[in-house]
Amino acid sequence: MLSTMSNLPIVAGISTTATTGTTSTATASTSTSGSVNTTATNNNNNTSASNSTSASSATANGGIGTNSGNSLQYYYTGNNTSNSVDGNKYSLPSIYFTPQDSINNTSHTYNPYTTVSGAVTPQNYQLDYSQSSTVNNNYQFTLPNQQLSSPQQQQYNRSYSNSLMPNYHYNNTTTNINTNVGSNTSPQLSNSNTPNPISPVLIPDKDNTYNNTNNVLVSSYPSMTMNQIQQQQQQYLQPSQQYQYSYNQYYMQPYYHNPQQSAPQQVQKPAQTEKLPHLSVTNIDYSSLVSYTVSPSLKRKRRTAKKSLSPSSTSSLSMMINHDSTNNGTTSTATTTRSSSTSSATSSSIGVAAADSFPCPQCNKVFQKPYNLKSHMKTHSNEKPYHCNICFKRFARSHDKKRHELLHQGVKNFKCQGYLNDGVTSWGCGKTFARSDALSRHFRTETGWLCIRPLMEEAKRLEEEEQQRQQQAQQQQQVPQQSQVSEQIGVNVGEIKFNDEYYDNSNFIKKLLQSNK
């Protein structure tokens, strides 16, 4: 028999079946006593015969049962032993043989070359990879009788299922394999303790002495040569190397950014320093700026505060002023004028507030005209017939809808910028706003106050010049009353209160500037 069969262990209790025909299957097993039970079944006559043979063939040939004229089919798992015949080494993969014998402690390695161990030459080694549903996808190869080293000249077929091919997947579990040949008492080979290789690098090489004992791998891939395994390793390694290179190239390399330094843009000023024709030296209309600076809400708050002043408090204030002047022993025109102006301003403001105020019954807003109150009341109703043509918003008033649509168009007609009387000096930050109330809120902020500060300083200077001009005119007309006129002017300039008539005057800007000093 083959020298490779010398390491097979002797297992008791396994029946042997031989089937005559084109493809016959037999399982040989020996008992410890040395007797071999062989059962042959003929496919044509459906007869069975039981023979009892001596232990000569079992002991001499490594426990292999024989049946003359019939070919035997074996299933092997485990390690492999290799022999040299004529200087050539032929061996089957280690996964097709049973574990090595305890007597033979030689370590075996995985041989990628699919060859047959024994006195078989490569020319006579024939593989049949035919697959069909009838043979259950089994691979078979035939060993002729002339190539057997045993005196028992017989031909047997060695077949293995498609599921016994080497596993090149990288799962960490092994699959149980049934080695049933025709008997229910056939053992099941399984091993889940030995880990499978988890990466292509761990696939054993030809000269590696790693012991693959009792490791049964299942796969549908055919056996591979060493060159194919190396190519597969390179295919697995190349993507990881490329990924690592791209990763290092993207994350590890420094990033150099050299932005082109552009020269700062210089604000182009008007080349002509001549005064603009539409601007006047003496008369400057600041009504638009004042209307932006002081919103109607501030007016309403001040008007509400003045309502709290009662006539008794006003009279007491005037009495206090007169009492102070009497105790000092001097009665001046300025003090009398101051008290009278205060009382008149207070009474006029109270009367105007009582007559021209139209408060909203649902909120704290107060309006000067009934039409404004009527328009405002629409905002408290649930009716919103005007809807935006661009978005889903709806409005109660048409002008609110038009003002909203300007936001979609990007129209910003209100700008914080202007020129002083000389036509060269500019004021403002240049920001644009879509609504006038947004610009007025900007003026009330600290930044907006700095924007209009040059304009206020110019207004203060022009008012002082106007006051000096008036004083000179009065001095020319009435020289004896010069002091009285100057005091009267001082009272009119410095003691004017914040009432409704004062909002449309440019003196308001001057008053705000003096209050911040």
From Swiss-Prot:
PROSITE patterns in UniProt: ZINC_FINGER_C2H2_1, ZINC_FINGER_C2H2_2
Induction: Expression is down-regulated during growth at pH 8 by the pH-responsive transcription factor RIM101. Induced during exposure to the weak acid stress of acetic acid, through the regulation by the transcription factor MNL1.
Annotated segments matching region Disordered: 19-64, 174-209, 296-346, 462-485
Protein name: Transcriptional regulator CRZ2
SMART domains tied to this protein: ZnF_C2H2 (SM00355)
Organism name: Candida albicans (strain SC5314 / ATCC MYA-2876) (Yeast)
Record flagged with keyword Repeat: yes
A GO biological process held by the record: cellular response to acidic pH
Ranges annotated as biased composition (Low complexity): 19-61, 174-185, 308-318, 325-346, 469-485
Zinc finger residue extent: C2H2-type: 358-380, 386-408, 414-446
Keywords in alphabetical order: Cell adhesion, Metal-binding, Nucleus, Repeat, Transcription, Transcription regulation, Zinc, Zinc-finger
